[in-house]
Amino acid sequence: MASRHSPQTAAQPDAADKAQALRLTPVSRETETRLDAYLDLLRLWQAKTNLVAPSTLPQLWTRHVADSLQLLALAPTARRWLDFGSGGGFPGIVLACAMAEHDGGHVTLVERNAKKAAFLREALRVTGAPGTVMLADIGDNVDRFPRALDCITARAVAPLHQLIGFAAPLMTEGSKVLFLKGQDVEAELTEATKYWKIEPQLHASLTGGQGWIVELDRIVRHAPSTTNPEAAAHDRH
């Protein structure tokens, strides 16, 4: 009798998970092949570098890949992306795999952990996806980051008001941000409006649960106010 941990039994839930993800967020055969290569590499590295929560490994396609791919529908013409805190590559590597089909497609992946940055570089090499890895903290001098971006992303990196602060200097006419957030999105938006004038669009995650995508296409910092000492202190920093 086969062990419950055998490749045969492990492959079945993975195949079902993949099929469900591709129903939610269809991709071309070429992109699917790149994503397969990426996930094979992730599983290999996961043993020595914690790239994703171990409990989510059986649902890599739905929990992570589809969650990342859904951003493409919200920015269908975007070709130049920047992903803050790329970690294990969600959404950055997934987006890069999709951008390989488009002329001028490119994803800049910003990651402060050297081991994870090394993984991201290897993932770009193995998949042939167009991208660049920057070993940097997302709070570093923004002059280091590329300009002329179409879309800025982040997933499970920092509170919303901080992410907006990191993205604001990189925004140009026609660009947008897409931040993947969880069940506390309303509280985070309330906090963010203390510091920023924003008109967010909220999109429920296609992958279910309590996930949300915050879409912003304009960010303006509130002027320092003596009636809002907390915002004024934030502005000084």
Curated annotation (Swiss-Prot):
InterPro entries found in the cross-reference section: rRNA_ssu_MeTfrase_G, SAM-dependent_MTases_sf
Main location: cytoplasm
Entry GO CC: cytosol
Family designation: Belongs to the methyltransferase superfamily. RNA methyltransferase RsmG family.
Entry EC number(s): 2.1.1.170
Transmembrane regions: none
Function: Specifically methylates the N7 position of guanine in position 527 of 16S rRNA.
Protein name: Ribosomal RNA small subunit methyltransferase G
EC class name: transferase
Protein's organism: Rhodopseudomonas palustris (strain HaA2)
UniProt region (Disordered), positions on chain: 1-25
Subcellular location(s) per record: Cytoplasm
One Gene Ontology molecular-function label: rRNA (guanine-N7-)-methyltransferase activity
One Pfam family cited in the UniProt record for this chain: GidB
Residues that bind S-adenosyl-L-methionine: G85, F90, R155
Biased composition annotated in UniProt, kind: Low complexity: 7-21
Keywords annotated in UniProt: Cytoplasm, Methyltransferase, rRNA processing, S-adenosyl-L-methionine, Transferase
